[in-house]
Design a protein with these regions (language model features):
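ABC-type ATPase nucleotide-binding domains, specifically the catalytic core motifs of the NBD
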Residues: 12, 30, 68, 93-112, ...
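Helix-to-loop junction immediately C-terminal to a conserved catalytic motif
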Residues: 48
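Short beta-strand immediately N-terminal to the Walker A/P-loop
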Residues: 30-31, 80
Length: 145
């Protein structure tokens, strides 16, 4: 479970995020929709530890991670994947996944984790040996996630 409670974020004198609360249960998929400048990216950057909130809290699996660094959040299984299809074009899908897991301390479950990725994005399983740069834009975004 992931939860944001009464999140407020400022950029200098600008109150960018005003009291957002959000709860996402395991297995749910949630989309943030809004106009340019509405705070979608700021909310995600704050949730992933890339921006500190002014007030409010961020919770993961019942633990307050508000003051946990972005790197530590990655170790907990949480990360921020911005738009832009940032993949290594000259490497295969599998090589991109392996590179993404390179810094993991627990490397014993990589095969199971890759199988989980492939179950969520079956097209990546079909293209695991294909160069990432030849994937469609949507497929590249799946791989980046």
């Amino acid at each position: 479970m992931f939860e944001i409670k009464d999140l407020n974020v400022h950029f200098g004198g600008i109150h960018a995020i005003k009291g957002i609360s959000l709860r996402v249960e395991a297995g749910e998929i949630v989309t943030l929709i809004g106009a340019n400048g509405a705070g979608k990216t700021t909310t995600l950057r704050t949730a992933s530890g890339l921006k500190a909130p002014t007030t409010g809290s961020v919770w993961l699996e019942g633990n307050d991670i508000t003051k946990v660094s972005a790197q530590q959040r990655v170790n907990l299984g949480m990360s921020h994947v911005p738009e832009g299809r940032r993949v290594f074009a000259q490497m295969s899908v599998l090589e991109n996944l392996e590179l993404g897991a390179f810094l993991r301390k627990d490397r014993g479950n990589l095969t199971a984790d890759f199988d989980t990725v492939y179950s969520r994005f079956p097209v990546l399983a079909d293209r695991r040996k294909q160069l990432a740069g030849t994937l469609s834009g949507g497929e590249q975004q799946m791989l980046a996630m």
